[in-house]
Protein backbone atom coordinates (compact mmCIF):
# COMPACT_ATOMS: atom_id res chain seq x y z
CA UNK A 1 0.00 0.00 0.00
CA UNK A 2 1.49 3.32 -0.99
CA UNK A 3 1.54 6.51 1.10
CA UNK A 4 -1.54 7.98 -0.62
CA UNK A 5 -3.62 4.84 -0.09
CA UNK A 6 -2.63 4.74 3.59
CA UNK A 7 -4.31 8.07 4.29
CA UNK A 8 -7.19 7.80 1.78
CA UNK A 9 -9.81 6.78 4.40
CA UNK A 10 -8.66 9.62 6.66
CA UNK A 11 -8.89 12.16 3.83
CA UNK A 12 -12.28 10.84 2.70
CA UNK A 13 -13.72 11.14 6.20
CA UNK A 14 -12.22 14.62 6.63
CA UNK A 15 -13.65 15.77 3.29
CA UNK A 16 -17.09 16.48 4.84
CA UNK A 17 -15.63 18.75 7.54
CA UNK A 18 -15.97 22.54 7.29
CA UNK A 19 -12.75 24.22 6.10
CA UNK A 20 -11.29 25.17 9.51
CA UNK A 21 -11.84 21.65 10.84
CA UNK A 22 -10.52 19.98 7.69
CA UNK A 23 -7.34 22.08 7.99
CA UNK A 24 -7.01 21.00 11.63
CA UNK A 25 -7.45 17.35 10.59
CA UNK A 26 -4.90 17.72 7.79
CA UNK A 27 -2.49 19.27 10.31
CA UNK A 28 -2.38 16.10 12.43
CA UNK A 29 0.95 14.30 12.34
CA UNK A 30 1.40 11.13 10.28
CA UNK A 31 1.21 8.65 13.19
CA UNK A 32 -2.02 10.28 14.39
CA UNK A 33 -3.56 10.15 10.91
CA UNK A 34 -2.61 6.49 10.62
CA UNK A 35 -4.15 5.62 14.03
CA UNK A 36 -7.19 7.90 13.82
CA UNK A 37 -10.56 6.23 14.33
CA UNK A 38 -12.93 9.19 14.33
CA UNK A 39 -13.44 12.94 14.35
CA UNK A 40 -15.70 14.22 17.15
CA UNK A 41 -17.46 17.55 16.87
CA UNK A 42 -19.26 18.71 20.03
CA UNK A 43 -21.14 21.98 20.17
CA UNK A 44 -19.01 24.68 21.83
CA UNK A 45 -15.77 22.65 21.93
CA UNK A 46 -12.85 22.22 19.51
CA UNK A 47 -12.93 19.15 17.28
CA UNK A 48 -11.16 16.12 18.71
CA UNK A 49 -9.45 13.29 16.87
CA UNK A 50 -9.93 9.89 18.49
CA UNK A 51 -7.03 7.50 18.13
CA UNK A 52 -6.98 3.83 19.12
CA UNK A 53 -6.53 4.57 22.81
CA UNK A 54 -6.71 8.34 23.27
CA UNK A 55 -8.50 11.51 22.20
CA UNK A 56 -6.62 14.60 21.01
CA UNK A 57 -8.06 18.11 20.92
CA UNK A 58 -7.36 19.83 17.61
CA UNK A 59 -6.47 23.48 17.13
CA UNK A 60 -9.85 24.11 15.48
CA UNK A 61 -12.27 26.79 16.64
CA UNK A 62 -15.19 25.75 18.85
CA UNK A 63 -17.88 23.85 16.95
CA UNK A 64 -21.08 25.75 16.14
CA UNK A 65 -24.46 24.35 15.15
CA UNK A 66 -23.81 25.77 11.67
CA UNK A 67 -20.63 23.65 11.50
CA UNK A 68 -22.60 20.51 12.38
CA UNK A 69 -25.19 21.31 9.72
CA UNK A 70 -22.41 21.93 7.19
CA UNK A 71 -21.11 18.41 7.79
CA UNK A 72 -24.59 17.01 7.10
CA UNK A 73 -24.92 19.15 3.98
CA UNK A 74 -21.53 17.93 2.72
CA UNK A 75 -22.46 14.34 3.53
CA UNK A 76 -25.80 14.63 1.75
CA UNK A 77 -24.44 16.70 -1.13
CA UNK A 78 -26.21 19.93 -0.10
CA UNK A 79 -29.56 18.68 1.18
CA UNK A 80 -29.87 17.50 4.76
CA UNK A 81 -33.43 16.43 3.93
CA UNK A 82 -32.12 13.75 1.56
CA UNK A 83 -30.61 11.86 4.50
CA UNK A 84 -33.79 11.67 6.61
CA UNK A 85 -34.45 8.03 5.71
CA UNK A 86 -30.84 7.08 6.32
CA UNK A 87 -30.62 8.88 9.66
CA UNK A 88 -33.38 6.85 11.34
CA UNK A 89 -30.70 4.49 12.57
CA UNK A 90 -28.75 7.38 14.12
CA UNK A 91 -26.00 7.57 11.54
CA UNK A 92 -25.36 8.46 7.91
CA UNK A 93 -22.96 6.48 5.72
CA UNK A 94 -20.82 8.52 3.34
CA UNK A 95 -18.52 7.70 0.43
CA UNK A 96 -15.84 5.24 1.50
CA UNK A 97 -18.06 3.56 4.11
CA UNK A 98 -17.40 6.16 6.80
CA UNK A 99 -20.29 6.73 9.21
CA UNK A 100 -21.46 9.96 10.76
CA UNK A 101 -23.18 9.40 14.09
CA UNK A 102 -25.61 12.13 15.10
CA UNK A 103 -26.74 13.42 18.47
CA UNK A 104 -29.43 16.03 18.91
CA UNK A 105 -33.14 16.63 18.53
CA UNK A 106 -35.47 15.69 15.69
CA UNK A 107 -39.07 16.53 14.89
CA UNK A 108 -41.20 13.37 14.99
CA UNK A 109 -44.63 12.72 13.52
CA UNK A 110 -46.36 9.37 14.00
CA UNK A 111 -43.06 7.78 14.98
CA UNK A 112 -41.21 9.01 11.89
CA UNK A 113 -38.43 11.58 11.71
CA UNK A 114 -39.80 14.60 9.84
CA UNK A 115 -36.96 17.11 10.24
CA UNK A 116 -33.75 17.79 12.07
CA UNK A 117 -34.04 19.94 15.15
CA UNK A 118 -31.03 21.09 17.10
CA UNK A 119 -27.82 19.09 16.60
CA UNK A 120 -25.47 18.92 19.58
CA UNK A 121 -22.65 16.69 18.33
CA UNK A 122 -21.55 14.24 15.70
CA UNK A 123 -18.80 11.70 15.23
CA UNK A 124 -17.30 10.77 11.89
CA UNK A 125 -16.12 7.17 12.20
CA UNK A 126 -13.24 6.41 9.82
CA UNK A 127 -13.78 3.12 7.98
CA UNK A 128 -10.69 0.97 7.74
CA UNK A 129 -9.91 -2.32 6.09
CA UNK A 130 -9.14 -5.05 8.59
CA UNK A 131 -7.64 -8.05 6.83
CA UNK A 132 -7.99 -11.64 7.97
CA UNK A 133 -10.82 -11.17 10.47
CA UNK A 134 -13.37 -13.07 8.39
CA UNK A 135 -11.34 -16.22 7.90
CA UNK A 136 -13.00 -18.17 10.70
CA UNK A 137 -16.47 -16.89 9.82
CA UNK A 138 -16.09 -17.97 6.19
CA UNK A 139 -16.44 -21.66 7.02
CA UNK A 140 -19.77 -20.89 8.72
CA UNK A 141 -21.30 -19.16 5.71
CA UNK A 142 -20.18 -21.57 3.01
CA UNK A 143 -22.02 -24.76 2.14
CA UNK A 144 -20.08 -27.01 -0.25
CA UNK A 145 -18.27 -23.97 -1.62
CA UNK A 146 -21.44 -21.93 -2.15
CA UNK A 147 -22.18 -18.78 -0.17
CA UNK A 148 -25.24 -19.20 2.04
CA UNK A 149 -27.75 -16.40 2.47
CA UNK A 150 -25.82 -14.08 4.78
CA UNK A 151 -26.35 -10.66 6.29
CA UNK A 152 -23.12 -8.98 7.35
Where do the language-model regions lie?
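N-terminal accessory targeting/assembly segments
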Residues: 1-97
